[in-house]
C-alpha cells in the first residue's frame, strides 16, 4: 500500500511539473551553438516569450472597479466647495443629493492629459541565437541546469548557460 502511495505522489508531482512549468528551449541536446535556442525549437518546450509577445495567443484584461476618493456628509455646504484629485484610468465621479435652487452643482471631468496611460507595449520577440558554424558552437555543451558543471544542456538562449 505504501508503494502505491509513493508511486501516486511521484506521478502527481511529475504531471504537475510538466503541466505548470515553462520549457527551457533545447532541453540539453547540444543545440546551443546552432542557433535554435532563441526560438525554442529544441523539441521540449516553446520559448518563454513566444506565447505572450503578440503572437497567436489573444490576451484579455480587465481593470478592477475604481475606489478611493469619497465625500459624504449630511451637513449643509454654503459657498464654494472645491474638491481636486486624480481618479484612476477608469474613474467615476458622482454627485448625489438635493441642491437648492439658489446653488449649483458641477463636476468637471477630463482625461487624456498624458499623465496616465499605456505608453508602449512590447514583447520579447523572436530570439536569434548565434550559431558558430555547422558544428557545436560556443557553449554547445555547457554547465547544464541541475547537472552541475560538465553537464550538457542549456537554457534555450543559444549559449549553453
From Swiss-Prot:
Region feature (3 X 5 AA tandem repeats of G-Y-G-G-L): 30-44
Residues making up the signal peptide according to the UniProt record: 1-21
InterPro entries: Chorion
Pfam families, per database record: Chorion_1
Region of interest (Central domain), ranges: 53-121
Lineage top rank: taxon: Eukaryota
Sequence repeats: 30-34, 35-39, 40-44
Keywords per UniProt: Repeat, Signal
Bridged cysteine pairs (disulfide): none
GO biological process annotation, one example: chorion-containing eggshell formation
Keyword Membrane: no
Location of the region described as Right arm (Gly-rich tandem repeats) in the Swiss-Prot/TrEMBL record: 122-161
GO MF assignments: structural constituent of egg chorion
Annotated TM spans: none
GO CC annotation terms, alphabetical: egg chorion
Similarity section: Belongs to the chorion protein family.
Protein function: This protein is one of many from the eggshell of the silk moth.
Protein name (record): Chorion class B protein L12
Organism: Bombyx mori (Silk moth)
Highest classification ranks of the organism: Eukaryota, Metazoa, Ecdysozoa, Arthropoda, Hexapoda
Amino acid at each position: 500500500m505504501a508503494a502505491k502511495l509513493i508511486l501516486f505522489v511521484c506521478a502527481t508531482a511529475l504531471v504537475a511539473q510538466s503541466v505548470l512549468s515553462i520549457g527551457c528551449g533545447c532541453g540539453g541536446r547540444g543545440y546551443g551553438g546552432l542557433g535554435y535556442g532563441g526560438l525554442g525549437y529544441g523539441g521540449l518546450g516553446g520559448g518563454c516569450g513566444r506565447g505572450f509577445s503578440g503572437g497567436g495567443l489573444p490576451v484579455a484584461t480587465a481593470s478592477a472597479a475604481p475606489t478611493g476618493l469619497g465625500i459624504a456628509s449630511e451637513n449643509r455646504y454654503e459657498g464654494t466647495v472645491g474638491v481636486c484629485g486624480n481618479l484612476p484610468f477608469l474613474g467615476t465621479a458622482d454627485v448625489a443629493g438635493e441642491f437648492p435652487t439658489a446653488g449649483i452643482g458641477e463636476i468637471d471631468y477630463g482625461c487624456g492629459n498624458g499623465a496616465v496611460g499605456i505608453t508602449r507595449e512590447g514583447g520579447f520577440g523572436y530570439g536569434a541565437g548565434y550559431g558558430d558554424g555547422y558544428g557545436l558552437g560556443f557553449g554547445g555543451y555547457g554547465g547544464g541546469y541541475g547537472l552541475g558543471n560538465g553537464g550538457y544542456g542549456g537554457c534555450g538562449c543559444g549559449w549553453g548557460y
